Amino acid sequence: TGSDGKTTTTTLISEMLKAEGKTVWLGGNIGTPLLPLTRQMKETDLAVVELSSFQLMDMKRSPQRAVVTNLAPNHLDIHKDMQEYVDAKKNIFRYQDGSGLLVLNADNDITAAFRGNGTTRFFSRKGMAYVCIEDGVICRNGKPILPTKDILIPGVHNIENYMAAITVVEGLVS
């Protein structure tokens, strides 16, 4: 989830997992409702789901792995205030247990203050974090992963989307 970058990040995660040979179900706010497809899913399959604040408002369960790309004032015509919007977004990790993974943008003032119940990993374009940029290369835990010049989708924000995806797929892809 996030204010911006949800669809791109969800798609990147899905493609990274598929490239590793995983069976991936992509859906949610991205256009495909997954609920009707759950009977076709196998226990070893992975679901990558884009969730909006509206979908998260009443959620009482959280996924094992969650990403919050960034948060900024959004949908305030629907939410009574910014705090209600932020609280809805927090539901993506609020119910994780100690084995959960939460991925957050350290460069966003709101998400930088969040902490999960399990492991919390940060990505940052501007400073040191678990996933950061060193000499033009996205690095995860100090190891080079991807030169930023190889990212063909234009825009600095898409570097952040890649960083979020690279962080959350750790342990699932080589």
Which residues fall in each region the model found?
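Phosphate-binding loop of NTP-binding sites
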Residues: 1-106, 110-119
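Adenine nucleotide phosphate-binding catalytic loops in nucleotide-utilizing enzymes
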Residues: 80-83, 90, 119-174
